[in-house]
Amino acid sequence: MALNLRKTHPLLKIVNDSLIDLPTPSNISAWWNFGSLLGICLITQIITGLLLAMHYTADTSLAFTSVAHMCRNVQFGWLIRHLHANGASFFFICIYLHIGRGFYYGSYLNKETWNIGVILLLTLMATAFVGYVLPWGQMSFWGATVITNLFSAIPYVGQTLVEWLWGGFSVDNPTLTPLFALHFLLPFVIAGLTLVHLTFLHETGSNNPLGIPSDCDKIPFQPYYSIKDLLGFVLMLTPLIAMALFAPNFLGDPENFTPANPLVTPPHIKPEWYFLFAYAILRSIPNKLGGVLALAASVLVLFLIPLLHITKQRSMTFRPLSQMLFWTLVADLLILTWVGSQPVEHPFIIIGQLASLAYFTIILVLFPIVSALENKMLNL
């Protein structure tokens, strides 16, 4: 009898091995849903982004007007725009939860998968930043000015680099056009990296909440986890659509309703909420170069996590001390996010500095110490 086409066809075989007959641990929890949710976020963002790009004009004199035109005159343009803007927020919620799950359950020991994942995060952050500039509102313009200007802190080449990025002596048309090109290109880079991420993941197979090998207890992905993922899609897309319909500007900045004006600086320049933790770390160091290095370190520190793993157990499931430290880190990140949205004045300055210090101390110092202590207590 002829074998199933999905098992023999060169292309369908790849799909089959990734989504249908994939052997999956039988005990992975809802925390493992965020990978597929990120995939749905990416597809949603590419589709809505493509529809927006058809009506957008990458020119300083027309960008703001073209976005307004989209919301007023294009069929469901307002909905597409708000799905795209809020979709970015959901993308970051999912990626932060996905990283948190990887950190908690020791998934970072699949080093290639983890490192590609960190590169994916950096690419996503770059994409979101350049996308935020495109509507050419006040916060778009000044956000672009402030963040690109950070490159001037690089010794010797900094100022030249900034002028090259700007295409002149300030953020203007030669800055906007390349940023639009980048914003169009980067999601496809993310899609390519996602395939690499999955390729490395399928080399080792998924981790599980116990952090032990699950080769003896695997079940096929279809139908068990495909239906579970479907539930995840519904639970994510429902609040996204509700937000786009009922509170589309809840996470946006009111300054962006004003067209960009180089002569008027907004009272508080701040990025979107998903960058606030890094922005707070940047602001907590009074020196410009030091701040830029701390900003970079706040994300690049993720590359070090596999090297700092000294515990004999993979997962934190049975390590209460590490669990306490993990949730302290989560609370610290929430404090940083809140501080980043506040003006630079007392007491927010000192709170931000203490929270930034705590962030690096927990990851680089306390986790290894506590891991060694747990090894000792358990005689491992």
UniProtKB/Swiss-Prot annotation:
Localization, UniProt: Mitochondrion inner membrane
GO CC annotation terms, alphabetical: mitochondrial inner membrane; respiratory chain complex III
Cofactor(s) for this UniProt protein: heme b
Binding site for heme b b566: 98, 197
Cofactor binding, note field: Binds 2 heme b groups non-covalently.
Any one GO BP annotation for this protein: mitochondrial electron transport, ubiquinol to cytochrome c
GO terms, molecular function: metal ion binding; ubiquinol-cytochrome-c reductase activity
Residues the entry annotates as binding a ubiquinone: 202
Membrane topology (UniProt): Multi-pass membrane protein
Superkingdom per UniProt: Eukaryota
Residues the record lists as binding heme b b562: 84, 183
UniProt xrefs under PROSITE patterns: CYTB_CTER, CYTB_NTER
Transmembrane segments: 34-54, 78-99, 114-134, 179-199, 227-247, 289-309, 321-341, 348-368
Swiss-Prot/TrEMBL keywords: Electron transport, Heme, Iron, Membrane, Metal-binding, Mitochondrion, Mitochondrion inner membrane, Respiratory chain, Transmembrane, Transmembrane helix, Transport, Ubiquinone
General function of this protein: Component of the ubiquinol-cytochrome c reductase complex (complex III or cytochrome b-c1 complex) that is part of the mitochondrial respiratory chain. The b-c1 complex mediates electron transfer from ubiquinol to cytochrome c. Contributes to the generation of a proton gradient across the mitochondrial membrane that is then used for ATP synthesis.
Complexes and interactors: The cytochrome bc1 complex contains 11 subunits: 3 respiratory subunits (MT-CYB, CYC1 and UQCRFS1), 2 core proteins (UQCRC1 and UQCRC2) and 6 low-molecular weight proteins (UQCRH/QCR6, UQCRB/QCR7, UQCRQ/QCR8, UQCR10/QCR9, UQCR11/QCR10 and a cleavage product of UQCRFS1). This cytochrome bc1 complex then forms a dimer.
Note: Heme 1 (or BL or b562) is low-potential and absorbs at about 562 nm, and heme 2 (or BH or b566) is high-potential and absorbs at about 566 nm.
Family: Belongs to the cytochrome b family.
Name recorded for this polypeptide: Cytochrome b
Source organism (scientific name): Aphelocoma coerulescens
Top-level taxonomy: Eukaryota, Metazoa, Chordata, Craniata, Vertebrata
